[in-house]
Amino acid sequence: MDLPCQDWVCHVEQKWAELRSEETERFSLLTDIDAIFNYGLSLICPEDLNILSRISEKFSVKKSPETASEFRQQGNLSFKVKDYPAAVLHYSKGVCHADKNTDELSLCYANRSAALFYQGLYQACLEDIRRSLEAGYPSHLQDKLQTRQTACQNQLRKAEKPNIPHTDHQLSPCQKTVNSTGHLSDGVSVYFSSDKGRHMLVMENKPAGEVVLEDEAYCSVLIPANIFNTGTNKAVETFGTEDRHCHHCLSQSLSFVPCPKCSYARYCGESCQKDAWDQWHQWECPVGADLLAIGVLGHLALRVVLKAGQTEVQMGIKNTKDHVTTYKNDSPVQLSLGGDCGKSLDHTDCFHGSSYMGIYSLLPHVAQHSPASRFLMAITMAVIYGKLQGGPPPNKWMSFKDEGVKASWQPEMSMLGATALRHMMQLRCNAQAITAVRVKEESGMAVQSSSEIRIATAIFPVLSLLNHSCSPNTSISFTTGFQPDPHNQLGCSEGHFDHPKGSRSGVTVTVRASKDLTAGQEILHCYGPHRSRMEVKERQRLLLEQYFFQCVCQACQRDLSEGSPNAKEHTAPGMKCVKCGKPLQSHTDGYTCSWSSCGHQISSADVQNRLQGFQLLLDEAVHLMEQDRLNEALHILQSAFSQANSILTETHPFQGELADALARLYASTGEWSLAASHLKRSLVAIQAQFGEDSIELGRQLFKLAQLHFNGRDGVASLSVIPRARRLLSLHCSPRCEELQELSEMEHCLQGLL
């Protein structure tokens, strides 16, 4: 939920509508962010704070012993049927809802330790045993914990012997060491020009797959999935991102440590818990429900300001006010890290690397936001600022720290709210979705589906400098948690900072060339609308609406020229004539057979209706598969396959989805050869849609290698692995799970053949 909840939006819209015309006009003319914030501050009253409090009741983050007990009991039910992963998730939610140092907390920890033990996670089990005892686990039950503790220690001692693997080989992400990030590779430089702003060029040839940039998120905020269930204070069955990922470093974990004050925030270990508390959570915690109500962007904007502190913000304000715009050169100028920043009023012609100034200097696009949108953001931040004043000011924002003097909110601290408003405006164009591949767990199928989902929203100071293309020459991947980087892939140059661990976010983006880049070429990133997934008009509409620019990338120019009134009819990709099977030509009103002797025509509406019908059949079949009703699903998929073949060629995206679903179904029944044959058919459609060097094709080849491996066809699996590895290596870290599994399969098969 990036934006505020609808109830709060409606309240602010009503407040906007009630303004007198002269007030509306006065606000609409304001372009200075401080003035916009102060105007919003002047309009709020205690009732606004009360209304937000009432709205946020449905997002309650209060501890609840009753809810903790419910989750523990649900965990017990999962434990009894040996569904240990689900048991751990239930126990973790119980841990988060239980009060500090209570029997309920100790019981949740103890039960979770048992579920972790049966998954072979012995180190994590020992940690939970320690936590349970520290929370006051009943003395008459401690024999069970001591027995489990001894068993864990024995297993870990066995694993220390050579050639004896064990499953608990990883440290908590919090315990891992970190290399500095936020740097460009050798041969990459930041430039500025009046038409492109800041952008990046490669100064030497870069082959596809080479890392060109690594950047660390300044801050990130998880996107909650179960936000509307939190207010019921009742245990719910499903688990969202907030239940699976550390709220500081975003790493996946099973054994979370909770915030001692609220039921929402949880961390992969005590280190992340402390770092988050020190940097922002001790001030976010009392207004946690309000932050869930105002949405991820408002929450992230506040978090950036809390982390930066008054000194950093004042430095940003002073530097921008001390300079006037003198930059008039139209030719690109190379920028050096921390170089002369006196050329522009807003520092948009400077390169600040990974520092806070890298965030502060991003354009807020004040004039491009509609007056109503500016009003919503201003009132929202003014009310949150008012809520924060219910507690002590953040340490980094206190005007004085004289011993014996009680800290209080000073008038000049309003810059906290104004700067948060600045960042909220910036995030409209500069927020970056953090994605992860998640396996769907609700299904009882032997073979489960996976999909890429958004788990968080972050802001990256260096990544934000990349310009957009609908057909980019880079791909990005994310790393979460504080992990070592033994590969040291980058020859570090500009933008290299050494941060103490406590100030780091643990969330890193790696940008790789997805195509061969030649010296002087601009590094381009896709903001979301991609040519392979969206028509040009829709892409341009979305980019103008959210990012305030008319895209003129090469892909858009090519697509627009093909669709111009002067352009000739062109072949409709993936479409064929229902009468003769020849390719269809698309035109303004519909489609015509390309074979002159046939000339059959079909309207666009008819085509859309057919495609929607195919999609409904596929959705129904997938639903049946998830219920393990495989025969019914197969009947529907075969019907959809027959109907689709009458009008769609093998390269149409729907044919790829259909073939993938059939492959999953046959894999569920152990018919590996049939599954592989259908998955091969999906490769044609995926390559046509995404390209022969795409990550999508690489992942599909990875699945094909798995099917051949499971079907004991080692020769076929070994023939697929090299191509899958090459494509995945273009887009992913060498440590990604897919590449590691490919190596394990290859090693196993080579030992057998």
UniProtKB/Swiss-Prot annotation:
S-adenosyl-L-methionine binds at residues 112-114, 467-468, 527. Its EC number is 2.1.1.-. CDD domains: SET_SMYD4. Disruption phenotype: Mutants generated by CRISPR-Cas9-mediated gene editing exhibit severe cardiac malformations, including defects in left-right patterning and looping and hypoplastic ventricles. Keywords: Cytoplasm, Metal-binding, Methyltransferase, Nucleus, S-adenosyl-L-methionine, Transferase, Zinc, Zinc-finger. It comes from Danio rerio (Zebrafish). Residues 186-528 form the SET domain. GO terms for cellular component: cytoplasm; nucleus. It comes from the Eukaryota. A zinc finger (MYND-type) spans 246-285. The keyword Iron-sulfur does not apply. This is Protein-lysine N-methyltransferase SMYD4. GO terms for biological process: determination of heart left/right asymmetry; heart development; heart looping; heart morphogenesis; methylation. It catalyses: L-lysyl-[protein] + S-adenosyl-L-methionine = N(6)-methyl-L-lysyl-[protein] + S-adenosyl-L-homocysteine + H(+).
